[in-house]
């Protein structure tokens, strides 16, 4: 996000205000860097949120467990040090292009409706979808609420992920997330891997495990970040700034632009 957020990542003003108020109270729960304090932290968080959060969402919070997979992934993050050619080779750029072109043809009506609504063509959406999850093949298998709760408890970025947890609990109330939802290690979900707050901000209704929902949300994200219909999206062109909002890594941004143009060229 960096992207949609992995890690960046409006909702209506009243919802935003509610979340801000919720966060201000919830931040009083004591963070920690080992599993030993997690259950106590959950109780503190729930006690402070009671009366503002629903019983259903708090029950979902209390059902979470400390995610060692999430902590391992978080501590093991590495910066992008590959050049563009190396990065594309590692990500299977040619496969993304060929599969993306086929999916563009197979889903022509969907992509036409998305472009009409948001001004975003198929190419960059397919490039993002292919790079994020291999067109849905690899969406992650970590419990989403446990991942986000673990990172909200963890002291390294507690404030950021407390905000994500508040959003996740709102999504539980809306039926978009459940205690069984699974995704990537930092709480990203769906075909294009949105963090909970981005689902709340840019989602267009329903789970992002639905392809149309995920692609519409992705186009909505790009439009909200300044995408202009018909303008170019290569480096130096107007819409590249919207792609930069998706992921902070320069090589990732350039890969989206290049793969998208190759998909759109046919």
Task: Tell where the protein language model's regions lie, with residue ranges.
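Catalytic glycan-binding domains that act on GlcNAc-containing polysaccharides
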Residues: 53-266
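N-terminal mature-domain "stem" immediately C-terminal to a signal peptide or N-terminal signal-anchor/transmembrane
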Residues: 30-65
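Sec/Tat signal peptide C-region and signal peptidase I cleavage site
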Residues: 22-28
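N-terminal secretory signal peptides that target proteins for export/translocation
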Residues: 1-6
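Bacterial N-terminal signal peptides
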Residues: 10-21
């Amino acid at each position: 996000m960096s992207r949609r957020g992995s890690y960046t990542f409006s909702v209506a003003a009243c919802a935003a205000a509610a979340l801000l108020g919720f966060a201000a109270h919830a931040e009083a729960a004591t963070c920690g860097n080992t599993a030993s304090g997690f259950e106590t932290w959950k109780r503190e968080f729930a006690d402070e949120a009671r009366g503002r959060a629903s019983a259903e969402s708090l029950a979902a919070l209390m059902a979470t467990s400390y995610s060692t997979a999430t902590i391992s992934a978080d501590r093991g993050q590495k910066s992008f040090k590959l050049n563009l050619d190396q990065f594309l080779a590692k990500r299977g750029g040619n496969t993304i292009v060929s599969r993306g072109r086929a999916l563009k043809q197979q889903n022509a009506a969907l992509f036409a409706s998305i472009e009409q609504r948001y001004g975003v063509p198929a190419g960059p959406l397919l490039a993002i979808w292919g790079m994020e999850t291999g067109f849905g093949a690899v969406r992650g298998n970590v419990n989403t609420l446990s991942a986000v709760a673990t990172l909200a408890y963890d002291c390294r970025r507690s404030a950021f992920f407390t905000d994500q947890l508040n959003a996740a609990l709102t999504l539980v109330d809306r039926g978009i997330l459940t205690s069984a939802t699974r995704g990537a290690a930092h709480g990203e979900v769906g075909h294009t891997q949105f963090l909970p707050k981005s689902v709340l901000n840019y989602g267009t209704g329903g789970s992002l495990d639905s392809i149309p929902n995920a692609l519409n949300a992705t186009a909505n994200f790009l439009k909200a970040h300044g995408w202009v219909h018909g303008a170019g999206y290569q480096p130096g062109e107007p819409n590249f700034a919207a792609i930069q909002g998706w992921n902070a890594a320069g090589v990732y941004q350039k890969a989206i632009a290049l793969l998208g143009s190759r998909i759109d060229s046919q």
